[in-house]
């Protein structure tokens, strides 16, 4: 039976439960344990796939094609375990499963209720996702006191009652606000948060106290006294300059030792080696170079919509000890002739998106980068914009467009995918009338790269696998015409039916590459990703006046 660490939050949301949990997971992993993570989200959507990026932020995609919460991105950036749809569960999915079972008659005519049917389904999902691991960390979304979270809290209370303290731990992250007028930290919100948690039958084993500054020992003792938590288990989580330094901070305070002692794992663990995290922090704090990258998107007012893109760019810089400064630009603002916002930029990245708003701005951005020889990296919609730009302005296909934006276009160079193979080899089909949710080409897909191309050079191998999330694709009817006009198709699906990567010849542009996949989902601070490393290096070379630079690894 896998020992479980349940991570809850109190007082306010967005305190960083996911980062704290992932940091602890990375320490336990460094000590030799096989670790996994899971997110329980209280919203009634089945998954975040159809939620607005302005409300929810990024939709993170796993290898098996699950559309999940962005916290799974945090998890995979901190731990080596690759997650799946089992690791992201919502209230919507729980109710969907229970109702499906009720319709099949699985409950034998019983009245279906929150307790025991909903809570049992939650526990079943937890068991399924965590089986076979040494330790599992499970984050409960939302804040204690929210009505939506109650079924999840009741389910984990039941787990603790049945398994005992040696197999289930409660970790509660709470706010200790600093009141500037009084010049002191206030512990009362934490006391009330724990009181709320205890009222539903959960006594925390560990408190993570988020604050602007380190919580002094006197306040930790006070919190311990009023919350019935050991002083040793009251952990200070102050604001830090580099988030990737959180594993080092939690290790310093001995959080991992609390877990090992409670779960009696001493005979399974070794000393923690966090040298990779120390190297990451050092590279962030002591860069040797810096570049300015423009990110031209549709949801830039809510930057969590591009969380993995921003992190992957920074990772690409870390591998070269280069600070990456991001300039966020709204695509709609670039739909005219004024491209002054892109002056003095070392590289341009156009990320994914849906719908016609801002698409023309992305096309204009591609045209600017192509003509001005600025390194360009297009992802998903950014690739489609680059193809439309090339079709219109180089191949002379007037009014070329994507059918997503103009179904009457005389040259639909981007069209709806009607049939494709999933990661497991199964054929999926869709049409214009299909549901939006869960009907895209999703998950890890292999692609073959063309020898002698930029893509092949950057990746360093012939076959690569990337995660996808898209409904529209390069229209094969225009392959030959655009290749004859000079566009290089450097990556194709293994069955040769889908275009995966396009680029410009190196003799016409220093670095212009666009891919249909989402490589940002496979980038980590310790390893980076070849495309982002190559793009940042190209930006550095542009800044250096075209001089070829040797990579300085972190």
From Swiss-Prot:
Please state the pathway this protein functions in, per its UniProt record: Pyrimidine metabolism; CTP biosynthesis via de novo pathway; CTP from UDP: step 2/2
Which GO BP terms sit in this record? Answer: 'de novo' CTP biosynthetic process; pyrimidine nucleobase biosynthetic process
Q: Which residues bind UTP?
A: 13, 186-191, 222
Give me the residues that bind L-glutamine, please. Answer: 353, 381-384, 404, 471
What the entry lists under PROSITE patterns is as follows: GATASE_TYPE_1 (PS51273)
List residues binding ATP: 14-19, 71
Please name the Gene3D superfamilies in this protein's record: 3.40.50.880, P-loop containing nucleotide triphosphate hydrolases (3.40.50.300)
Q: How is its activity regulated?
A: Allosterically activated by GTP, when glutamine is the substrate; GTP has no effect on the reaction when ammonia is the substrate. The allosteric effector GTP functions by stabilizing the protein conformation that binds the tetrahedral intermediate(s) formed during glutamine hydrolysis. Inhibited by the product CTP, via allosteric rather than competitive inhibition.
What does UniProt give as GO cellular component? cytosol
Annotated CDD domains: CTPS_N (cd03113), GATase1_CTP_Synthase (cd01746)
Annotated keywords: ATP-binding, Glutamine amidotransferase, Ligase, Magnesium, Metal-binding, Nucleotide-binding, Pyrimidine biosynthesis
EC number(s) given by UniProt? 6.3.4.2
Q: What sort of enzyme, by top EC class, is this?
A: ligase
Catalytic activity, reaction form: UTP + L-glutamine + ATP + H2O = CTP + L-glutamate + ADP + phosphate + 2 H(+); L-glutamine + H2O = L-glutamate + NH4(+); UTP + NH4(+) + ATP = CTP + ADP + phosphate + 2 H(+)
Q: Extract the GO molecular function terms from the UniProt entry.
A: ATP binding; CTP synthase activity; glutaminase activity; identical protein binding; metal ion binding
Record-annotated residues binding CTP?
Answer: 13, 146-148, 186-191, 222
Name the catalytic site residues: 380, 518, 520
Q: Does the keyword Nucleotide-binding apply?
A: yes
Q: Any idea where the Glutamine amidotransferase type-1 domain is?
A: 292-545
Please give the residue ranges the record annotates as the region Amidoligase domain: 1-265
Annotated residues for binding of Mg(2+): 71, 139
Further information in the entry reads: CTPSs have evolved a hybrid strategy for distinguishing between UTP and CTP. The overlapping regions of the product feedback inhibitory and substrate sites recognize a common feature in both compounds, the triphosphate moiety. To differentiate isosteric substrate and product pyrimidine rings, an additional pocket far from the expected kinase/ligase catalytic site, specifically recognizes the cytosine and ribose portions of the product inhibitor.
Assembly state and interactors? Homotetramer.
User: What does this gene product do?
Assistant: Catalyzes the ATP-dependent amination of UTP to CTP with either L-glutamine or ammonia as the source of nitrogen. Regulates intracellular CTP levels through interactions with the four ribonucleotide triphosphates.
Q: Which family does it belong to?
A: Belongs to the CTP synthase family.
List the protein's name: CTP synthase
Q: What is the lineage of its organism?
A: Bacteria, Pseudomonadati, Pseudomonadota, Gammaproteobacteria, Lysobacterales
């Amino acid at each position: 039976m896998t020992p479980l660490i349940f991570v809850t939050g109190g007082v306010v949301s967005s305190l960083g439960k996911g980062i704290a949990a992932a940091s602890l997971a990375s320490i336990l992993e460094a000590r030799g344990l096989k670790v996994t993570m899971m997110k329980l989200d209280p919203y009634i959507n089945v998954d975040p796939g159809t939620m607005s990026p302005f409300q929810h932020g990024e939709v993170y995609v796993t290898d098996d094609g699950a559309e999940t919460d962005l916290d799974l991105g945090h998890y995979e950036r901190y731990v080596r375990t690759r997650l799946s749809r089992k690791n992201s569960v919502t209230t919507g999915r729980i109710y969907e499963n229970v109702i499906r079972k009720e319709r099949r008659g699985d409950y034998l005519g019983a009245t279906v209720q929150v307790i025991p049917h909903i809570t049992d389904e939650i526990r079943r999902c937890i068991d399924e996702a965590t089986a076979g691991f040494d330790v599992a960390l499970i984050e409960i979304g939302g804040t204690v006191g929210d009505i939506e979270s109650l079924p999840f809290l009741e389910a984990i209370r039941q787990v603790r009652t049945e398994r005992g303290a040696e197999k289930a731990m409660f970790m509660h992250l709470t706010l200790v606000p600093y009141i500037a007028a009084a010049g002191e930290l206030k512990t009362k919100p934490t006391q009330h948060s724990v009181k709320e948690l205890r009222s539903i039958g959960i006594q925390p084993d560990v408190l993570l106290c988020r604050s602007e500054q380190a919580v002094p020992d006197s306040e930790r003792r006070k919190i311990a006294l009023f919350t019935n938590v050991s002083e040793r288990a009251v952990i200070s989580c102050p604001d830090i300059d580099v988030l990737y330094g959180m594993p080092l901070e939690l290790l310093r305070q001995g959080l991992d030792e609390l877990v090992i002692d409670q779960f009696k794992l001493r005979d399974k663990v070794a000393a923690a080696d966090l040298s990779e995290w120390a190297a990451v922090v050092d590279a962030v704090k002591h860069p040797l170079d810096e570049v300015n990258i423009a990110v031209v998107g549709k949801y830039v007012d809510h930057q969590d919509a591009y969380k993995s893109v921003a992190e992957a760019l920074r990772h690409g810089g870390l591998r070269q000890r280069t600070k990456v400064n991001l300039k966020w630009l709204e695509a709609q603002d670039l739909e005219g002739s004024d491209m002054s916002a892109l002056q003095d930029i070392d590289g341009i990245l156009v990320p994914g998106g849906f719908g016609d708003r801002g698409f023309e701005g992305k096309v204009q951005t591609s045209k600017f980068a192509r003509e001005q020889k600025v390194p360009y990296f297009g992802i998903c919609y950014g690739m489609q914009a680059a193809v439309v730009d090339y079709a219109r302005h180089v191949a002379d296909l007037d009014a070329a467009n994507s059918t997503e934006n103009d179904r009457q276009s005389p040259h639909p160079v981007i069209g709806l995918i009607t049939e494709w193979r999933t990661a497991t080899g199964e054929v999926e089909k869709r049409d214009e009338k299909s549901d939006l949710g869960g009907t895209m080409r999703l998950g890890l897909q292999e692609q073959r790269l063309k020898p002698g191309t930029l893509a092949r050079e950057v990746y360093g191998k012939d076959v690569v696998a990337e995660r996808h999330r898209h409904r529209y694709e390069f229209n094969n009817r225009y392959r030959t015409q655009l290749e004859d006009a000079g566009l290089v198709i450097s990556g194709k699906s293994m069955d040769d039916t889908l275009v995966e990567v396009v680029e410009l010849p190196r003799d016409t542009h220093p670095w212009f590459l666009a891919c249909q996949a989402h490589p940002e989902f496979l980038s980590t601070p310790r390893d980076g990703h070849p495309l982002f490393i190559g793009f940042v290096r190209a930006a550095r070379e542009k800044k250096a006046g075209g001089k070829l630079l040797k990579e300085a690894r972190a």
